[in-house]
Amino acid sequence: ITGYLSTAGGSTAEETAGNEEDAAGNEEDAAGNEGDITGNEEDEDAGQNEETAETVRAYGFELSDQSGNIHTLEQYEGKVIFLNFWATWCGPCRNEMPEIQKLYEEYAAQGEDAEVAILGVAGPGMGGEGSAEDITAFMEENSYTYPVLMDETGEMFSYYGISAFPTTFMIDREGNVFGYVSGQLTEDIMRSIIDQTLAAN
């Protein structure tokens, strides 16, 4: 998985705090790195130093989804979390949502024994996004049923330093950030990053 694990809750989040436009990003940025999990030289260096990198705790969220259900980080303890940040106006986001729904249905069918939780995150009113009601209507119109957390304050977007859509973070079983990928993902890549995170601990 590409990405500097130590920046997820550090300077990147601080630089983007309160900046809704940066948090929203744009479709070109999101599509520019579609599913690249190979990274560049800097990413490779980061991977080599992964063992010595500081562990970054996942954001301790308590947010409601499109159905009004409350979700917390603690309730997913012991599970890997596939955390997908997206927007209704984002073309690459729309393109990958059927695959995310497919994975959600697959893991949901396993019930309490499922090792993986699939969650979306949207920012109502941020960067051109509509209201929570608009996001819910979009999900219903497209028959998407996986939970989408409504980050009304933008705190979760800020913590993870979201600057383009879609961006997917993987959270390990211990509630720590394993890594992230920016750009549209294929189903194969989604399964690959899930497997990588499952194997981590």
Question: Which residue ranges define each predicted feature?
Answer:
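N-terminal targeting signals for export/organelle localization
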Residues: I1-A58, N201
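Short pre-active-site segment immediately N-terminal to redox-active cysteine/selenocysteine motifs
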Residues: K79-I81, W86-W89, A164
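A short beta-strand-turn-helix
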Residues: A53-T55, G60-I81, E105-Y107
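Conserved hydrophobic/aromatic "anchor" residues
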Residues: F61, Y76, F85-W86, F138, ...
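Thiol-based oxidoreductase modules, predominantly thioredoxin-like and allied folds used
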Residues: E112-G130, T145-T153
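Short, internal strand/loop/helix patches
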Residues: E133-E174
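Conserved helix-turn-beta segment immediately C-terminal to the redox Cys motif
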Residues: K79-V80, N95-A122, E140, E187, ...
